[in-house]
Structure formats: C-alpha cells, structure tokens
Swiss-Prot record:
The enzyme's E.C. designation: 2.7.1.40
GO molecular function: ATP binding; kinase activity; magnesium ion binding; potassium ion binding; pyruvate kinase activity
The gene coding this protein: pyk
Assembly behavior: Homotetramer.
Family of the protein in this entry: Belongs to the pyruvate kinase family.
Source species of the chain: Methylorubrum extorquens (strain ATCC 14718 / DSM 1338 / JCM 2805 / NCIMB 9133 / AM1)
Matches recorded under PANTHER family: PYRUVATE KINASE
Official protein name in the record: Pyruvate kinase
Site (Transition state stabilizer): 217
Top EC class of this enzyme: transferase
Ligand binding (Mg(2+)): 219, 243
C-alpha cells in the first residue's frame, strides 16, 4: 500500500479505537504508526493490543509502527476535607508532608524529594495551570506559597513545576514494568515522558538495548537548556505541546516547536509534533480553520510525523480525524512553497560516509529529476540520512529486518519493504527496480537511484550509489 504523502501520521489508540475493526479503519484512513499510552492501558492488555496491530499488518502486507508511551513521573496533591477547597488570590497556602486531608490553608504533597528541591520564587502549577502558586519560604518537609491565581482545587490534582529540576529518576517502577512489557511484546518505539536531561534518555536506552528505538518527549522547559544533547542521544523526538504549554507561556510554544523541529532535522532524528492538533474533532466531524492551519504549519516545517491524541483515542470521530490530517498533509505537499521551504532549511552534510552518500544521492535526484531512491539497509541509519535531506523523491527502504522496516514508518518520506538481502550487485539492481515498479514508484523507462553497501549484509557499510533503468522485464516480474 503506497501513501501519497511523505509526512507520517501517528494515531493514539484508546476507548474509541481499541477494537480490531476500528484499528483497521484508522490504518486504511492513513495511520502509519499507532501510539499506545501506558497512562491509560493496563499492562496485561498490551500484548493483546499489539497483536491486533500485527494481524492487520500481516493482512495489509505493509509494516506498521508501534509506539509505546511511558507515563513518566506524575506529581499529584493529596486529598481535601470534603474533597475540595477554594483558594483566594493573595492568600498563603502550604504544601507539606502531613498525609492528613487538606483544607484552605494546606495540603499533602506526597513527594518529599520535590519539597526539598523547591526554592523561593519557584512557580507551582496545579490542575494543568488553572491555579498558580509562588514559593515564598521553604523548610524541611514544607513549602509556603502565595496564591497568584486561585480557584477550586480538588483531590489528587496534578502538579507541574516549570522552574524546578525534578530530582526524580527518568522511569518510575510502573514505567520499568511497562517498558519491559512493551519490549517483550515487540514495540518498535518507546516514548520517554518528562525528559529533563540526556541521562533520562540514556537510562531507557540502556534497558532497551536496541530492542526498540527511544523517543524523547520534550515537555519540560528544563529540557530546552540541553536540547541538542537530548536530541543527539535520542532516536527520535516528540514535541509534546500539551505539558509545554502548561509549564511555559503559551505564546512561546510555537517558537519552541520550530526550534525543536529544526534541531531534530539537522541531527537527522525523526520529529513528531503532537497534542491538540485537531482537538475540536473530539466532538465535531470537522476541524476549526485554526486547527487545519496548525497541522499544515507542522507539515510545512518539515516534521516527520503529526500525531493525534484524544481525537483518535477518545473522540467521536477518530476515522474522520485521521482522514482530515491525511488530506491536509497531502495538500501541503502539493504546494510548491512547501518544497522551497524545505530546500531553504537544508543543512550541510556531516563528514561521514553515510551523509556523503545521502548528499550525492540527493544531488543526482535533483539533476535527473528522479522519482524514487531505492535504499538497501539493515539498521535504517542511511535511510534516515536520506530522509534528513527531504528529497523531492520517495525513499524506498529495502531491508531483510522486519523490525527496521517497522521503525522506519516514523520517518519522513520513507516507504519500507521487507525483503531478503541482495546476493550480488546485479541482484541488488534488478530487485530494486522491480520493487519500484511493483510499489508504483516507477514505470517502464524511468531511472531509479540505488543506494547500498558492498559487501552486502554488513550494517553501516553504505558505500555505493547506482542508477538503474526500469525495463519491461522488471515490470513483468514485479
């Protein structure tokens, strides 16, 4: 199945889309990768959910990516007498280590490590930023605050700390169990929530040990101070605008989105733009004009993928939301301005063999107006370098490793195919041309560019670029 767009679509599964029939509909509507949010799925149900996707994959004969999203450390308040309290602007309010129910003067914060990390002037956001406190005084097991924005506060509401580096590990015990379950069930990508530093990603990568790629979710302002380091150590990046918009001024989020996207592209890492892209489609069959522009902007910026969260997980119109996102991406990619923007954002190749080969392939594509690049790959790294340049040609990844094909479903412009490795140079060229015809990326008389490594079967050995003509024999044997 050939998609007519290069930008990929990630669909979150949930109550509105967890049946085999609905997952299949989402796939045919345009979903390339399915996200499973471990904040809302019981661990024991994960293997079953993944197997449903694999069944659809086998029937469709096209790789489907699976992203398992770890919950990460969730900070929450304790309870209140009467289940709630109302805080007034300007009043004093205390967070402490006393587990008894709170009132209008104080409440339990069941995270002693957070109380010890707070400092005067630090902000505290409660219930997605609906209430805002400023720390005025800190002592052992106690933080005194001034209420800047008050309101009703109820049991176990979430707490965000935009100015505080959280002294908590990257993974909770729940995350560790979910990670092992995801790896055992065959997840292709693992998303790490609330990343603050490169070490958070390194910890997950150490456990994953190559069994899945690791994606860092940028949703804490602290991550921006070490953004390049985090992106370098990660296999992919998600711009998680929801929590970013809570912990930093909303008007700064678009600029941050552009910055993250550009750095990820420069470093050759897939970047996903997420959160509230088509939010109104949770309850409406059509999006707002602003939402259409939001999705289009992410595509124009060159994001590898755009993601739906509640729209596909819990909305009334999950299939329509995927279809809408699909049409927006297709329309943007037909715009000549899209390609001129991508061209203006290209960066110089890194001084590596893979980058040099990718740059040469890109120049040949432009000089000869070729439609497709056929890339033989084991690890997928050269394919990602090809996609990094955003060529005006489809990148067809030919790999003997099914896990590589699935991981590449996240990458811009890549059409992955699982096939046995080439036996020699002639077999490499013939089968590449044959697949180009079979997948409708080329016709008889077209030329295709082939990127490969000799000797075959050795990861990281990409060292050859070749041009092949598509003949009638290729078409007859496709």
């Amino acid at each position: 199945m050939k998609r007519s767009r290069r930008t990929k679509i990630v669909a979150t599964l949930g109550p509105a889309s967890d049946t085999p029939e609905m997952i299949e509909k989402l796939f045919h509507a345009g979903a390339d990768v399915f996200r499973i949010n471990m904040s809302h799925l019981a661990r024991e149900k994960l293997p079953e959910r993944i197997e449903v996707i694999r069944t659809i994959e086998r029937e469709a004969k096209r790789p489907i990516g699976i992203l398992v999203d770890l919950q990460g450390p969730k900070l929450r308040l304790g309870t209140f007498v009467g289940d709630a309290a109302v805080l007034e602007n300007g009043q004093t309010f205390v967070l402490d280590s006393d587990p008894t129910p709170g009132d209008t003067d104080r409440v339990f914060l069941p995270h002693p490590e957070i109380l010890s990390a707070l400092e005067p002037s630090h902000g505290i956001l409660i219930d997605d930023g609906k209430l805002r406190l400023i720390v005025t005084e800190v002592s052992e097991g106690r933080a005194v605050t001034r209420v800047e924005v008050g309101g009703r506060i109820s049991n176990r509401k979430g707490v965000s700390l935009p100015h505080t580096v959280l002294p908590v590990p990257a993974m909770t015990e729940k995350d560790r169990g979910d990670l092992e379950a995801g790896l055992a069930a065959g997840a292709d990508w693992i998303a790490v929530s609330f990343v603050q530093r490169p070490e958070d990603v390194a910890e997950v990568k150490k456990v994953a040990a190559g069994r899945a790629l690791v994606m860092a979710k940028i949703e804490k302002p602290q991550a921006l101070t070490r953004l390049d380091e985090i992106i370098e150590i990660s296999d992919g990046i998600m711009v998680a605008r929801g929590d970013l918009g809570v912990e930093m001024p909303l008007e700064q989020v678009p600029g941050v989105q552009k910055r993250i996207t550009r750095v990820a592209r420069r470093l050759g890492k897939p970047v996903v733009v997420a959160t509230q892209m088509l939010e109104s489609m949770i309850t409406s069959p059509v999006p707002t004009r602003a939402e259409v522009s939001d999705v289009a902007t992410a595509v124009y910026e060159g994001a590898d993928a755009v993601m739906l969260s509640a729209e596909s997980a819990a909305g009334d119109f999950p299939v329509e939301a995927i279809g809408t996102m699909n049409r927006i991406a297709e329309q943007v990619e037909r715009d000549a301005l899209y390609w001129s923007i991508l061209m203006a954002q290209r960066s110089e190749p890194e001084p590596t063999a893979s980058d040099a080969i990718a740059a040469a392939a890109h120049q040949i594509v432009e000089a000869l107006s070729l439609r497709s690049i056929m890339a033989w790959t084991h690890s997928g790294s050269t394919v990602l370098r090809l996609a990094r340049a955003r060529p005006n040609a489809s990148v067809i990844a030919l790999t003997p490793k099914r896990e590589t094909a699935r991981r590449l479903t996240m990458a811009w412009g890549v059409h992955p195919i699982v096939t046995k490795d080439a036996s020699d140079v002639d077999d490499m060229a013939f089968r590449a041309a044959k697949f180009a015809v079979r997948e409708r990326f080329a016709e008889i008389g077209d030329r295709v560019i082939i990127v490969a490594g000799v000797p075959f079967g050795i990861p990281g050995a990409t060292n050859m670029v070749r041009i092949a003509f598509v003949t009638r024999e290729h078409a007859e044997r496709a």
